[in-house]
């Protein structure tokens, strides 16, 4: 009886706390539940670009590559990159989705990359793997997913660039190094670079160009210590362009 009374008392306290935090706790709970259900219904978010992909496919030749087309596949860092601003007059396609991990991108690789018949693709991924966005992952698991995408690109004659994971910092409002270990970032980048060398792919080194003397993402390149700002993207754009040219030269 005493246990039941304690449980009831605890339930009342929790209910009061929830009510204080939200003017409409039932609505907030429903919104969270709906969001979780939507994620479960389309875990890799194939629907995000389905309409845009269909439109591009309807305009492209039945066979062969679309001249000059490059697909940028990635997470929020790619998603927030206004490619038309940094690569004017280039038929580059942005297929970044905020929060995504390499297993999600691997599922998206066919509809969002292969089916668009690009000459080249740039993959920037891994930071959310380290954060465990879709569950715990090892560095080997991340490398395996990148390798699978690389093999798909090779089979479909897509010149591939794999980018380093960017550094993070604690200079912003949140300590990004808590979820994104700088040591793990360095280890993952070493693996990516080694894989690219072994398989004749272009490794795009954003990391060293954005790093400060403390081993952090330079403060002037980010407002939150994780995502590049305009100045950060300005550094990244010419590096990406050089890497794309190098990748295309290798397949000619």
Give, region by region, the residue ranges found by the protein language model.
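Hydrophobic residues at beta-strand termini and immediately following loops
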Residues: 73, 95, 204-206
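Cell-envelope and extracellular/periplasmic
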Residues: 96-98, 125-126
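N-terminal secretory targeting modules
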Residues: 1-71, 83, 245-252
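Alpha-helical cap/lid subdomain in secreted, periplasmic
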Residues: 85-91, 106-252
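Catalytic nucleophile-elbow at a beta strand-turn-alpha helix junction centered on a G-D-S/GDSL motif
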Residues: 67-83, 98-101
């Amino acid at each position: 009886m005493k246990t039941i009374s304690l449980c009831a008392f605890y339930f009342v306290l929790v209910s009061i706390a929830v009510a204080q935090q939200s003017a409409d706790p039932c609505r907030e709970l429903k919104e969270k539940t709906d969001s979780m259900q939507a994620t479960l219904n389309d875990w890799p978010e194939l629907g995000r670009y389905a309409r845009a992909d269909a439109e591009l496919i309807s305009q492209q030749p039945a066979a062969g590559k679309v001249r000059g087309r490059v697909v940028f596949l990635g997470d929020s860092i790619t998603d927030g990159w206004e490619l038309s601003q940094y690569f004017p007059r280039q038929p580059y396609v942005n297929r970044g989705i905020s929060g995504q991990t390499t297993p999600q991108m691997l599922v998206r690789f066919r509809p969002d990359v292969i089916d668009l018949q690009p000459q080249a693709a740039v993959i920037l991924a891994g930071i959310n793997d380290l954060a465990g966005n879709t569950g715990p992952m090892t560095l080997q698991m991340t490398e395996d997913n990148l390798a699978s995408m690389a093999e798909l690109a090779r089979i479909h004659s897509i010149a591939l660039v794999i980018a380093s994971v960017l550094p993070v910092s604690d200079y912003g409002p949140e300590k990004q190094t808590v979820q994104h270990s700088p040591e793990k970032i360095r280890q993952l980048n070493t693996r990516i670079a080694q894989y690219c060398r072994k398989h004749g792919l272009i490794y795009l080194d954003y990391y060293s160009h954005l790093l400060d003397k403390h081993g952090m993402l330079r403060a002037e390149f980010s407002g939150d210590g994780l995502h590049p700002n305009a100045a950060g993207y300005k550094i990244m754009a010419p590096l990406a362009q050089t890497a794309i040219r190098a990748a295309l030269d290798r397949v000619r």
